[in-house]
Structure formats: structure tokens, C-alpha cells
């Protein structure tokens, strides 16, 4: 039986690979996509998500979400993904439109009408998830778990200590980690090692149409290089859902710093239990890199 999921995303080049996996991994059933401002503005992430759904002729509804973090100005990652968020490939024109309701409302409606709890997957800033929990706190009972790409038990990639998705909206992340949801955190401890190797990247144009498209996008992705390998941060969250055996997880208490002058957005991951707080997340601390690479190649080969 396929696992029903809702994907909250901010495409984003590595998001495109994650969306492909969410659509074509045989273990998963993508029921709804929502967008959030993050890698680029929400108008651009929505356009990019619609382009991808049209590219794959995917019958998945999409709702546009938050245009700004809860209390802070938006700082994007156009320097990594390009000004459009998905530089490098010319998608064909289409007439697709997002749903006429905001993302948190669309998620709430999908949860409340589902026959069983649904897994949420958030691979961008957590603004939409925080809004959902604020507006509809009763929804926690309809969420099986929340799998996020975000955070780090060590160094950051946006500031010295903070990972991008958490740093963009620390207040949203703090609310989510204190929500009581079952959370799986796939952070930089594993995603920095989740490389697609150069020899595999070179084969993508001959694989299928998806391979051609991803190769064109990856050529403009500034998280690694085509010659040394590219980090697939967002793909890790989907990989854990499809093949959890690839990851080593540890229950930890995770707090999000919201006040620090230099440390805002840092995830304080209490690996050794020094704070005496109960664990509120399962934190991925290790990954089978070769197994991840095999899985990624297999799932991309399943796409058209």
C-alpha cells in the first residue's frame, strides 16, 4: 500500500529532484503540493512547481502558500538556484493554476477529508506548517508524522550555525518543533553527504526526458559541481520515506534559536541529553551514501 503524502516545497533545483521522487517512487502517493517562499519568492516557487507538474503530466493539486516568514523579511537563495529558482531548462507553456485557497487551508482540507492520517513532508521553510498549526491546531491528530529537510546538529550552510530552511523562518520552525508532532529531521548532517556523483550526472541526458531536464537544471545548481558531485538536500526527505533503512536516526530534543544576534535559526540538537528535555524529533545523523545514490538512480529511471 502506497503511503499518502503532502509535499510543501520551494522549488528550487534540488526540489525538482525531490518532486520527481515523490511522484514516481512506488512506495509513495503524492496527494497535494503546496509552495512557500524560500529559495525564491512564492510567486516563483509556485510557477516552478506548476511547470514541473505539467512536465510530468501529474494530476496533483497545488496551493500557493506564504509569501513571507512569520515575522522576518524574506532572504532567498537565488545565488544557489538562479533568479527564477530553476535556471537552465525551458519549460513549455501551460494553463495550470493553483487552487483558490492558501496552502495552510488546502493542507487542512486534505487532512480532514482523508480516511487516515497523512504524512507531511516539508522541504522548504516551515512557514506554511506553522500557519496550519496556528489556525487549525486540531489537525495534529490527522498528521501521521512530519518529515522535514532542515536543521543541523553541527554547522550551518546559511550562517555558521544555521541551515537555510530553518534560518529563513526560525519562529515558524520553533513552533513546529514544539507542536507535539512526530518529526523526522533530515538535516545537513546527512544531506551534505547525499551526493549525486559526477559519473551518474553525466548519464542523465541519455536516461529519459526527466534526466534531460534535471541535467539542464543541475548544470546551474550551485551546491557542489557537475564534476565533483551535487548535494541533494531535499531528496533526502523523500529517500527516508521510501527507504528509511538508508538512514541512522536518534531521538533528540531539538530547540530552535530565535533570539540570538549571531545564532538565530540554529537548531540546538541535544544528542547527549544534557538539557534534560524529552526528545521531540528523530534526527538523521548518518546515511548510507552508496545506497542513497542507488535509490536515487532507480527512482529517476522510473520517471518518463
Curated annotation (Swiss-Prot):
Picking any one GO molecular function of the record gives: purine nucleosidase activity
Q: Which GO BP annotation is one of this protein's?
A: pyrimidine nucleobase metabolic process
UniProt-listed Enzyme Commission number(s)? 3.2.-.-
Recite the UniProt keywords alphabetically.
Glycosidase, Hydrolase
* SUPFAM superfamilies named in the record: Nucleoside hydrolase (SSF53590)
| Record's GO cellular component terms | cytosol
The residues annotated as the active site are 233
Superkingdom of the source species: Bacteria
Kindly indicate whether the keyword Hydrolase belongs to this entry. yes
Family under the similarity heading: Belongs to the IUNH family. RihC subfamily.
Report the function annotation for this chain: Hydrolyzes both purine and pyrimidine ribonucleosides with a broad-substrate specificity.
Its protein name is Non-specific ribonucleoside hydrolase RihC
Q: Which organism is it from?
A: Klebsiella pneumoniae (strain 342)
The protein's gene is named rihC
